[in-house]
């Protein structure tokens, strides 16, 4: 059986390509339960892709003849471990204080981009929690990311769990200024979905480094501190795009407004896509 999948331009990550967590969440919707999605190439935006089932419970996503991603259920995976909890006050206190925000390499990103307006991007800006190997950020879902029942759509939860783990992993190893990271693989388990207006927070923690591969975990906490979802991710270090996109000013505590709106007009990604294709092929299930 074949289905069609399109990633709208709003949900970009690196310039001209889909945000990895959002793309993984859209793909995971074709399967039940915890799912592992492996990204083989950057997902194009506003372009129909084909979703193919293999008859054994796995799926492949293709853009023409190019393999974009593979996904499979992860029923045997152990419960995703959450390394500590963070209060909403703690998350607010550290928001935007990560080293990444001194010079973010993807300011147009739907999740962590400083160049996205409230109601357009998720604006999740994690910072390190003092004395703990944890990064945290507050997140209050807006009405644009919920379903008809008022609950956050699952792919938005995947997206929210994506960038914080990458920022935690990159900052923990002291990623050089000439490097960036790209999501290669993500496994997520969703227990409950928050509602629009819920004062949530996202936490993340680094795991380990293996050459150019970094692994990290993340979790979404509800207003009462309950774990709503958790994920683990593998990231690959790549050369930073050259020239880097322009970066707007970003204060220590993210403002409610003041960043330019995302217009959908993005830099030419051709050089970057070639790099991503080469690097993401190294992630294997």
Language model features with spans:
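Non-catalytic linker/capping segments at the edges of enzyme domains
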Residues: 1-4, 56-151, 253-273, 281-285
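Short hinge/gating elements
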Residues: 9-13, 145-146
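Hydrophobic beta-strand-centered segment that forms part of the acyl-chain substrate-binding groove
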Residues: 11, 15-18, 23-50, 54-55, ...
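Residue-level detector of beta-strand face positions
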Residues: 36, 58-62, 217-219
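A short, compositionally biased
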Residues: 53-59, 212-215
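A mid-sequence, solvent-exposed acidic-amphipathic segment
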Residues: 123-191
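Accessory, usually C-terminal, subdomains that scaffold auxiliary metal cofactors
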Residues: 180-254
């Amino acid at each position: 059986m074949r289905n069609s999948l399109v990633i709208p331009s709003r949900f970009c990550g690196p310039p001209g390509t889909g945000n990895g967590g959002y793309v993984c969440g859209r793909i995971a919707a074709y399967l039940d339960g915890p799912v592992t999605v492996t990204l083989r190439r950057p997902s194009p935006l506003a372009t129909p892709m084909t979703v193919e089932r293999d008859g054994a419970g796995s799926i492949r996503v293709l853009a023409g003849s190019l393999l974009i991603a593979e996904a499979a259920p992860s029923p045997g995976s152990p419960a995703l471990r959450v390394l500590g909890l963070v209060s909403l006050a703690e998350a607010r206190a550290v928001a935007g204080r990560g080293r990444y925000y001194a010079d973010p390499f993807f300011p147009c990103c739907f999740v962590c981009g400083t160049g996205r307006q409230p109601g357009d991007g998720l604006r999740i800006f994690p910072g390190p929690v003092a004395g703990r190997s944890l990064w945290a950020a507050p997140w209050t879902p807006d009405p644009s990311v919920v379903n008809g029942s008022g609950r956050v759509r699952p792919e938005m939860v995947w997206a929210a769990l994506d960038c914080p783990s990458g920022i935690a992993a990159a900052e923990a190893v002291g990623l050089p200024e000439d490097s960036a990271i790209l999501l290669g693989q993500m496994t997520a388990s969703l227990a409950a979905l928050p509602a629009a207006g819920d004062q949530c927070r996202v936490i993340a923690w680094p795991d380990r480094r293996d050459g150019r591969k970094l692994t990290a975990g993340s979790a979404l906490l509800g207003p009462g501190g309950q774990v709503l979802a958790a994920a683990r991710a593998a990231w690959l270090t790549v050369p930073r795009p050259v020239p880097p996109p322009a970066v707007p000013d970003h204060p220590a505590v993210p403002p409610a407004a003041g960043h330019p709106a995302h217009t959908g007009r993005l830099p030419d990604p051709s050089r970057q896509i070639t790099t991503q294709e080469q690097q993401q092929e190294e992630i294997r299930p």
